Amino acid sequence: MRGRTLRRTRIRDRFVFRSGYEKGVLVPDSPYDIIILGAGPAGYVCAIRAAQLGMKAAVVEKENLGGVCLNYGCIPTKALLRNADIARILTTGGGVYGFQTGDLRMDYAAAVKRSRRIVQRMVKGVELLLKKHAVDVHRGSAVIHEPGAVVVAAEDDSAPLRLGAKHIVVATGARPASPPGLVPDGMRLFTYREAILQEKPPESVAIVGGGPIGLEFATLWNAYGVPVTIVEMLPRIAPLEDEEVSAEVAKAFVRRGIDIRSGAPVQSIETTDTGVPLEVKTDGGTDRIKAGRVLLATGFRPNSEGLGLEALGVTMEKGRILVDERMATNIPGIWAIGDVTGKLMLAHVGSAMGIACAENIASGSGAVLEYEFLPRAVYSQPQMASFGLSESQAAARGLRVRTARFPFQANGKALGLGEYAGWVKLIADETEGRLLGAHIVGPEATELLPELTLAYRAGLPVKAIAQNVHAHPTLSEVLMEAAHGLSGGYIHL
């Protein structure tokens, strides 16, 4: 830049610069309305929606498009869990279906390779979607240098790129949170990011954390014959789910040989050449657990550091970027969506936030999200799905409610599948019959929830669900039956 004169030209009320933190060269052909930092489910969806609304959009991503969900989380785990379902059926229930599987061989590496092919296909799909909507993709790490200006440090030795836009959206996601004093080595002591890539299952494993990640990996490895112990500091696994749902899943896990230690905070973990012994606190003192490896599945920490937010005065709390219902921060022109806000760290919630944010930027008409009533899903075996209030939460708020529960074992399709453990529970306002919550545990529970969340959003009474004719035989009939139970009486119970 030496010897050059910095030029500045007004372009549609925005300034765009290239190269350097303090100096730049005007790039008249790249004015942006919106720049999104991060191309995960929140970021890339926000960019696409912004482009659909007529904005010139760009994303900055330092890793793979699709974020953690697509590359290391939601998608590859679901691919592996499909393999786990097949393995479980053949090894524990093959005789019921008439299969003789005495010499069955299972290739875990093949399952992992299959999952990576699916990831590659979907990453390419995101790339094509962004290209289709004329969204520019800049590779590298971004810093918000000032409101309206982003500096991108490329991964190679090329000069930094300075971009400008009226609106900057932070969608940088979150990373695994490890307990204090524990540093994963990626081998004996590891997180989901390492676990999802390794082509050999653990010889034995202790999973610290009984939330969605811990339960899904427990389901996977148990199906491949790995001895699994789940260590949860709270009184029950799946602690954010309805108490009865947690109990049903725990019962199923124990039946399959998974050891559950709940109410057992980890006191110490020692990494050795031969394994990773743990000491956990129990009512009677301490207990020692021997495991070949330890998976840390204790939650997430927002990726809000190193973005320049502190210098700009963006309000944060324990790393979470605080936003209002429009996804706006306290600094005009800076927005935040997805896991980095700490609202509800789920991919589909991030995508919904991204759409709402883009619509609010474009016209101020974006949806206001009721996070408590958004769907939650856990793809363990059995699956869990829920939204809204549990019975205990409703009682704590002084709400008068009615509940109905219908079992999958009274459903013809579930019996035909041979997967009939579990039930659906609906919670409704006692006076108006308005749906306040639903909790499902059982086969394909995660696929059944949208009908119920739509009914809630539309303000429909449970009677409308009961009167909605469901195809027979389908698993979804359990929803209709439970709704009948709330509005006049069960038909098949």
Each model region followed by its residue ranges:
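A Rossmann-like FAD-binding core segment of flavoenzymes
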Residues: 16, 21, 136-139, 143-156, ...
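Short hydrophobic core segments
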Residues: 35-37, 142, 162-173, 208, ...
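Glycine-rich flavin
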Residues: 24-32, 48-55, 60-201, 229, ...
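Beta1/beta-strand and adjacent pyrophosphate-binding region of the FAD-binding site
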Residues: 28-40, 201-211
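Glycine-rich dinucleotide-binding loop and its adjacent helix/turn
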Residues: 74, 172-227, 231, 310-312, ...
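Flexible, glycine-rich terminal cap/loop adjacent to redox cofactors
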Residues: 35-40, 45-63, 75, 79-86, ...
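FAD-site-proximal beta/loop scaffold in flavoenzymes
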Residues: 186-201, 288-363
